[in-house]
Amino acid sequence: MFRALARASATLGPQVAGWARTMATCQLLVAPPEALLRPLSIPNRLLLGPGPSNLAPRVLVAGGKQMIGHMHKEMFQIMDDIKQGIQYVFQTKNPLTLAISGSGHCALEAALFNILEPGDPFLVGVNGIWGQRAADIGERIGARVHPMIKDPGNHYTLQELEEALAQHKPVLLFLTQGESSSGVLQPLDGYGELCHRYNCLLLVDSVASLCGTPIYMDQQGIDVLYSGSQKVLNSPPGTSLISFSDKAKNKIYTRKTKPVSFYLDMKWLANIWGCDGKPRIYHHTTPVVSLYSLRESLALIAEQGLENSWRQHREVTAYLHGRLQGLGLQLFVKDPALRLPTVTTVAVPAGYDWRDIVNYVMDHFDIEITGGLGPSMGKVLRIGLLGCNATRENVDRVIQALQEALQRCSRNKL
C-alpha cells in the first residue's frame, strides 16, 4: 500500500506543484458582494396582473420542504401524482402527459420542437403576443410559417380557419385559448374536428386560461395542449404542463429528423415521467422543490373541483366588470362571450398615460396591475384574477386603487 502511495505521489508530483504555484500567484479580485451580506427582503404585494399570481398558502409551505433526490422512488411518485393532476385539469386520458422543467415558453418550444420538422407548413393564429412567439419559434426551426394576423381583441371563426387550412394544408395549427395580452377568449368547440378533416394537428396555449374557463382536451379534439404553473394554479413560475394526443405522439415517433433540442426531446421526457412503460433513466435534473409546489397546486384544484373553479372565476370577473364600468372605464373586448374570465383588459382612458396609472396603484397600494403587451401595448390595462386571488375583496381593493389613481394622475385634456 505504501509503495502504491509513493508511486502515486511521484506521478502527481509535477501536477501538485503546478497547483501550488497557481494558488501562490493568483489572488481573489472580486470581493463578496455587499448586497448578499444583507438579509433578503421581499415586499408583501397583491399580484393582480396577468401572472405570476400570489402563491396559495399550501403551495408556499410545499416550497419550503427539504430536498430529496430527483431519481428517488418518492420523487417518481410525486411526478406520477402531477401527471394525474394534469390529466384532470386538461380533461384527457393521454398517456403522454407530463410537466416541463421550464416556464410556459418552454412548453411551447417543446410542442413545436417535437411536432414540426424543417419545411413543415405551420398555420399560426396571431391575435396577440403568444401567436407572435409561436410564429417566431416556428421560423427558427425551419417550418414554413403562415400567420393569420388579427388585431388584438379578435378571435378566429371556424369559417376563417377552414379557408386557411384548405389554402395552406398545414401539419399544425396554433391557437391561444386565453390571449392574456388582449383579454380575448378563443372558442374551441369544433376546431379540433375541423383540423382533423384537413389532416392537421391542433396545438392550444392555455397558459392564462387553464382552470379559469372550461377546456376539454379529448372531447374538443386538441392534439397538443400546454399551460403554465404561475397563473390560476398559484404555483411558482418555472414549471409547465403539456399533453400529446395519440395522433401527435405518432407524429413525434415517426419524425425523419431529431428534435432540435435534447433538453426538450419528448422521447426522453416521456421516459423520465414514466409515460413509456420503461424503467426511468436520467435525462436531466428535475426542479424537485418546484415540483412539490406544482403537485400541491394541482391537489388544491382537485379538492375544489374544476367546475367550482370555473364558476369562481366567472362570477368574480363579472363583478369586476361591473365595478370597472361603474368607474366609467371601457372593457377592451366588446363581446361578453369572448372575454377571458382570468385576465380583464380595460381600454386606457382618454388623456391618461397608462404607466402613470400602473405606477400609482403599485406605489400607493402595493397592488400590481399591468399595461398591454406586444400588439396591445399602450392600448389596455390588464387586471388578473387568478386562482386564490379571484375574490370580491380583491376586486374592491383594486377598484379603490384605480379610482384614486384616476383622480390623482395627471390627464392630458387635449
UniProtKB/Swiss-Prot annotation:
Its cofactor is pyridoxal 5'-phosphate. The keyword Cytoplasm does not apply. The modification N6-(pyridoxal phosphate)lysine is found at K231. It is an enzyme of class 2 (transferase). The modification N6-succinyllysine is found at K247. Pfam families: Aminotran_5. One of its GO terms (molecular function) is L-serine-pyruvate transaminase activity. GO terms for biological process: glycine biosynthetic process, by transamination of glyoxylate; glyoxylate metabolic process. Residues 1-23 form a transit peptide. Its EC number is 2.6.1.44, 2.6.1.51. The modification N6-acetyllysine is found at K247, K256, K334. Substrate binds at R382. Keywords: Acetylation, Aminotransferase, Mitochondrion, Peroxisome, Pyridoxal phosphate, Transferase, Transit peptide. A motif (Microbody targeting signal) lies at residues 412-414. GO terms for cellular component: mitochondrial matrix; mitochondrion; peroxisome. Homodimer. Belongs to the class-V pyridoxal-phosphate-dependent aminotransferase family. This is Alanine--glyoxylate aminotransferase. It comes from Felis catus (Cat).
